[in-house]
Regions:
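Structural marker of alpha-solenoid helical repeat scaffolds
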Residues: 6-7, 41, 105, 136-140, ...
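Residue-level recognition of tetratricopeptide repeat
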Residues: 11, 20, 44-45, 75, 84, 109, 118, 153, ...
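Register position in tetratricopeptide repeats
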Residues: 24, 88, 122-123, 157, ...
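TPR-adjacent "capping" and linker segments in tetratricopeptide-repeat scaffold/adaptor proteins
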Residues: 4-6, 63-78, 211-218
Length: 336
């Protein structure tokens, strides 16, 4: 099924509706075949929940929220897609308008309420968001986890990261047999709150179970390597980041992270420069990568080349203090 691993867009809802169609037409084995191609770690909420239903033979759950033979359900989906588009453009008012129409036509599709909660969250209407999140109880395990994460994010906004992570870790500890997606998310939450030791603990739990053929392992090694780097354990950081590049040698962000780490340590400058040239060739309009290669030229005292890249980085990201500091240092060296 070509849409599952298609890198050119998010086809998760189409995959959900195809699985729904197969089940509705009693083509269970075909639905299982599609589900077996999905991975919890890199699937959307809707597909993760769908995979869980298929894996646990809860096929009736699909028909409870959507029917391919119901015209209202179909029209509702088109309206939801329009709403989602406006939400991605942060036009919350228009998004809510189409979302209300969608929910009116198909109130059964309770899982679509995640977009309602997201819109309230983006609008800083946290109490309204929390009321919507109550729709997701434990029978929808992935949506229940979404609820807990969003509640933790709201607490973080109100009271800071420490309160937010305390809430999420408390809820996480009560989940029996958390799946790898939940472990991945809690690791990311710890990393974002700068509790790198705990993040490493959970990343390691997942990494040890993954085969090198899975690209998601490359991402996990990148995240764990970044955590080691923040702790100053450069040996383990370098091991993880190089292992990540062994799996996916064309990941511009891993190339940039490892190279910039080496630059900061005044370590393997020439090799770091080659990695940055490759990263820049892959992502020439990324401000962080552009800044990194400019700073690499600065460190080898090629200030003319450095100025060219850092100037572009400033244009791409004018408010960033680090980029502006780098630009100031280069202009000083050039007596400008």
């Amino acid at each position: 099924f070509n849409l599952i691993n298609n890198p050119d867009g998010d086809y998760s809802r189409y995959i959900f509706f195809y699985i729904n169609y197969l089940i509705e037409n009693n083509q269970i084995e075909e639905a299982k075949a599609i589900s077996n191609q999905l991975e919890y770690l890199n699937s959307t909420l809707l597909l993760s929940q769908s995979k869980s239903w298929v894996d646990n033979k809860n096929f009736k759950e699909f028909g409870k929220i959507f029917s391919c033979n119901n015209y209202n359900d179909i029209i509702s989906e088109f309206l939801f897609l329009i709403s989602n588009l406006y939400s991605s453009q942060e036009d919350i008012e228009k998004s809510n308008f189409y979302l209300n129409l969608s929910n009116y036509l198909n109130p059964k599709f309770i899982l679509n309420s995640t977009l309602v909660a997201e819109n309230f969250y983006l609008n800083d209407e946290f109490e309204k968001a929390k009321n919507i999140l109550k729709n997701f109880d434990k029978k929808y395990e992935f949506y229940y986890w979404f609820r807990l994460k969003k509640e933790a994010q709201i607490i973080t906004k109100d009271k800071g990261y420490e309160e937010g992570i305390d809430y999420l870790s408390s809820k996480f500890s009560k989940i029996k047999n958390p799946n790898e997606k939940m472990i991945f998310d809690i690791a990311n939450f710890y990393k974002n709150s700068k509790n790198y030791e705990k993040a490493i603990e959970y990343y390691t739990e997942i990494i040890s179970s993954l085969d090198d053929s899975l690209e998601i392992k490359s991402d996990l090694l990148y995240r764990r390597g970044g955590s080691y780097e923040r702790l100053g354990d450069y040996q383990k950081a370098d091991e993880d980041l190089k292992y990540s590049l062994k799996i996916n040698p064309d990941d511009a962000y891993v190339l940039n992270y490892l190279a910039y780490s080496w630059l900061e340590r005044d370590y393997k400058i020439e090799e770091a420069m080659e990695m940055l040239k490759k990263a820049y060739a892959l992502r020439s309009n990324d401000p962080y990568i552009t800044d990194s290669i400019g700073w690499a030229y600065y460190l080898i005292e090629n200030y003319i080349e450095a100025e060219k890249y850092i100037k572009k980085a400033v244009e791409l990201m004018p408010e960033d203090p680090t980029v502006n500091d780098h630009y100031g240092d280069i202009l000083w060296k050039l007596d400008r």
